[in-house]
């Protein structure tokens, strides 16, 4: 015979998202905030909260940033400590983190634009060290198959 339980708490259709968010918070939030720095002094969202909101969109089957406001906000607000920001806040933070392109003109006169995204590349490396994907003192080769 099947056991039936009656739950009094509210449920979310995105089963498991809260455990993923809690794992993210325990592993990467402090790394993100220490790498990217303080975003605002009083009220507002930290960069880790903004990146977590962005991540939640895609882990919940969303396809655009606006999905956090239109579909997820009500469900993610069920978590007792989670602060989820709006799509406008996510877009402002992405703009804050951008860097200007660097232009290079070759000897033949051809112009090239590139972007080193130093801050975000540093964040990527710090997150990979924090999650154990890279080890301090190890050597890694990175190459591209074509």
Feature-to-residue mapping (PLM):
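Dynamic "connector" segments at or just before major functional cores
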Residues: 1-146
